[in-house]
Amino acid sequence: MSRMLRGGKQMINLMDMSIPGMKTHLRLGTKYNKHIYTDAMSKIVKGVGGKQLFNLFDVSLRDGLQALKTPMLMKTKRDMLHNIISRNVKHIEIGSLVSPKILPQMADSVKLFEYSKTIGMDDINYYMLAPNSKYVSKALDIGVENISLITSVSNQFQLKNINKSLEHTKDDIDKSISIISNSKLQVNNLKLYISCVNECPIVGKISPSMIVREILYYAEYDDITNICLSDTCGTLSVDIFEQIMLILLLEGILPSRLSLHLHCNSNEMERVNSILKVCMSHGVTMVDVSFIESGGCSVTMSEEKINRNLSYLDIYDSLK
């Protein structure tokens, strides 16, 4: 709801969409001047002085929802999609092609993807996550032109998450890329999430050398347009991140190929802000965000250990 203030300026309660049982990315009760907020988001998305600040990738409909036990109505998901589109982001993950027995919330991802194609926003890249080569084939069959794949730097995590070892995942991703290359459908973007950067929820901390080794392996695939460093546990420190970034850049990986997926809680924003500043200093502009305060890997983590996704407001606050 919004109201008018003196002088005709509109104030907006930035919890501009009600989702039962959930908070949006903007803290409950928080109010901002709508014009100031809109201007700030425009600068984030479009840049300042010709220099882009962040290229936001919205994961609200996939990572933001996947841990919810009660399936959300399609109408609510459609409303969420329009809410996301209104934020001027150009990359939106619609859902995941996965067995509904594993993630019931993703059961209608295909229907939501089909709906997205009727909206008429040709400048938006709609993504679907495909956890293995079988679902990559399905994604291509339904016309998905932007696909997300997943791996990690932890063998135990990968076994629990998708029932494949890291080595078997490598084989399957190679198969997925081959399927995409031989497809009649032109795939515009291929994103690869590399989970457990810094820490695995099962075995604990992962050495930076192991993390870098796995990233460099996948960087050899020219078909992978976006290598996303995913801080699954929400414990990545700025020092470790800086160390990883410097090695990757020295190895010749372009900043434009890298992106970041953070998990956090509202009590540790200094850490998050420092990491985002490192991103900006090295030219890494793509960052995953969600406008609902949820997210995380429910397959491998208990509810009390899951930290939420980075939000739009977190990005906004980091630039103040």
Predicted regions and their residues:
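Alpha-helix-loop-beta-strand connector modules within alpha/beta enzyme cores
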Residues: 102-127, 169-183, 188, 242-260, ...
